[in-house]
Amino acid sequence: TQLYGDRMLIANATGCSSIYGGNLPSTPYTTDANGRGPAWANSLFEDNAEFGLGFRLTVDQHRQRVMRLLSEFADKLPAELNAALHTEASPEARRQQVAELRQALTGVEGAEELLTDADALVEKSVWLIGGDGWAYGLDHVLSLTENVNILVLDTQCYSNTGGQASKATPLGAVTKFGEHGKRKARKDLGVSMMMYGHVYVAQISLGAQLNQTVKAIQEAEAYPGPSLIIAYSPCEEHGYDLALSHDQMRQLTATGFWPLYRFDPRRADEGKLPLALDSRPPSDALAETLLNEQRFRRLNAQQPEVAEQLWKDAAADLQKRYDFLAQLAGKAEKPATE
């Protein structure tokens, strides 16, 4: 919201983020000195992707209607202003142009509708926000080419309903109704969506690398198509002191549990590989880092041999996934020549 809040539309899936985002009378959202701030709405748990897509389609249709109205009054406007309104401009420059438009058409007969809706000419930033429980089945929206930004707050479980397993739950984690530990690897949503080829995809962790987080958000918003940001999100269901969450996030990235990357299809147009891998190969011991969290310690206390084997399997899986990302990014080790 600090980057785009004055022109931001948020479709928020039901879950933890909708509780702290819309639980009146308090709200984390505010307005700036000009009275502009995010427009927020909450959808049902399952359909937030379609709900947010509707935002984008509505904004685009609204803008097209205003552009048609603008063409009807082209002869009433200075030629330079009319040309500027038909070319790309920053939000700040566009707002200035809209102010000039209103000044030029004030008092002109029949221009009332255009004057009322002229703010539609300022590009809106549409964001679909929700947890992994909702978001790991949203490719029906990403398969399209609409300009929506999707932020997945990935807690690796259904946090708002007590911590049940989701497709994002990692191998070996104990969850509610899953006391024997997850026995298969989590779905790799990011890599799956890269395969479309037209989707901007980033995996971020605020505590692991702040600059990469901000850069990914800026690139996603600037990308003229669908974008997906998967953000590691600490949760009380993980079972550790969240005051230490940034330290844990750094360790999880160092072990390869949460690699950082940005997949930007525009890079291919520049003759570059689309994927930029922003974290190093796994180095820290995985088991030691996982033992910081109760969701992994519980299985170790109940079935230590099973836990040890699952952690070995998890480490091998994470290394394999990192190696695959490294190949996509052109960072794979070259075989020695004979």
Describe these PLM feature segments:
Residues 10, 14, 227, 305:
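P-loop NTPase catalytic cores that bind/hydrolyze ATP
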Residues 12-13, 23-26, 216, 241-245, ...:
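Composition- and surface-driven signal marking solvent-exposed, interaction-prone regions
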Residues 33-87, 231-338:
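Flexible, low-complexity linker and terminal segments
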Residues 107-109, 113-114, 120-149, 153-280:
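Glycine-rich ThDP/TPP pyrophosphate-binding loop and its adjacent helix/strand module
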